Amino acid sequence: VLAYIAAQVCSVLKCDLILWFSDTGLEFPELKKHVKSFVEYLKRIYTGIHIELVIDYPKDKNGKRISFRDVILDVGYPIISKEVAQKVEFARSKPDGYCAEAFDPDSDYCKKYPKNCLKRWRGLLEAPFKISSKCCDIMKKKPAKAFEKMYCLKPILATMACESSLRRNDWLKNGCNAFDRGGRQRPISKPMSFWLEQDVLEFIHINNIPIATCYGDIVEKDGILTTTLYKRTGCMYCMFGVHRELQPNRFQILKDTHPAIWDYCMKPVEEGGLGLRDILEYIWVNSE
């Protein structure tokens, strides 16, 4: 949707449009295919502007491509939410810090900020595997910032405040266009921050915009627009928020739609897989 809107604006202003995509290896095969076909679709509609697709990859300091498996073995698994995963990681590294206090209901921190108390996830501190929120930073944000710096460009993102508490708080603090945040924070535009999922589906439906086949079709049920297959795609292996999903959850659906990928996800790390089965069992989530 954002690419479509940006192309409309660029068509009016007669300026070039650069669409940047990080091929992390976590995207659905249908989504990766759609990225290229959608750019060709935009070029057919907006013939008066130059539209360029840049496909990038997450790399280490030596230029070697980084995989999700590299990330989980190095820093840990992304589970529950970015906030919880980050606090678990910090609490483990500094047991006497405020992040550790967030898991103790009797601590001064939890008494002062009861809404921020994470006692429900206290058991994660003793989990027999690494936990981290750094996956998105490594796989998407770091290569994006490197691209921005190299070509002196500023990003326009399609993130929405309704997607997480962190994004909601960021929107409330900075608004849609945060060009003067100061410090080390880069200028950034998030014009869809106030959109809801229904707004996105309605915009696609009204403008007859093609979507990746993994979503299926957009249909109306009881006055609400929805997709017939996946509701969200994101990263196939990510476990953020899966504990809140009704069954069938994303991994149960993945087993039906992409069995080979599901097998790789669940296979133990020692056998070359990602070892997600044990992680999901630890947080009481069914994987099949």
Feature-to-residue mapping (PLM):
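ATP-dependent adenylation/nucleotidyltransferase module used to activate substrates
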Residues: 1-199, 206
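ATP/NTP-dependent adenylation/nucleotidyl-transfer catalytic domains that generate, transfer
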Residues: 184-185, 193-288
